[in-house]
């Protein structure tokens, strides 16, 4: 594999030019047979945290006031400008608007000093061909004072391919087998402005999350909640059960969460962390499954 193309910014770039290129670009929805991935690495050398922005995120995801430190999934939204730049570089082979978020792993490695700047790095080098399409991994990391404090791997999916099935089976977080006793439950009210509120905080204005009309253009009957909002909301619901230390959060996204609707967040305290699920109010359909463990 060739060395990565490296692009460096002093600070996080504006997303406006990237959005224009996403909307006007002519990339395919899946990579053609024989596509060779050229790695790319982007960095923002100075990312400054905003107390007001953190508070807005906490409000959108209903993070309780008693939860200490940065919400575990917050730094994902600050990386959105670099994610957008990554999607439009020539090295990335497919159209971002057709991608589906399959899995996410976050590792919270050290407390973040909200008064000190961070260095942000985003990296892409992997495409896997599976039975149903193509999977792409994006690695995001933050350093503070030379120490990696937060890491994330997001796995995205592009439907359809005629190429060889090279992808290995990935570990699956199945529906929880925990008993109904000992479970903490929380009814989540997903209001009709949830998509817009999260978009304004995250900068991710994907049309499928905003209105029923724009979502229908991409095959959805209603707007659907952003997967990272669902994750952040469930982590907020389970905040009292999550250790305030080094943790790893493994999430699998299942069925879409329609806007507006209700959902049920369920949390089981287990040795070294918590198991969390988000499902329909009847409990018969799973929206996401999550495992939080200490490192």
Protein language model features and the residues they cover:
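Hydrophobic residues on conserved beta-strands that form the core of alpha/beta folds
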Residues: 44, 151, 246-248
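Hot-dog-fold acyl-thioester-processing enzymes
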Residues: 1-103, 163, 167-168, 176-241
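Catalytic-pocket segment enriched in acidic/His residues
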Residues: 213-264, 268-270, 278-283, 287-289
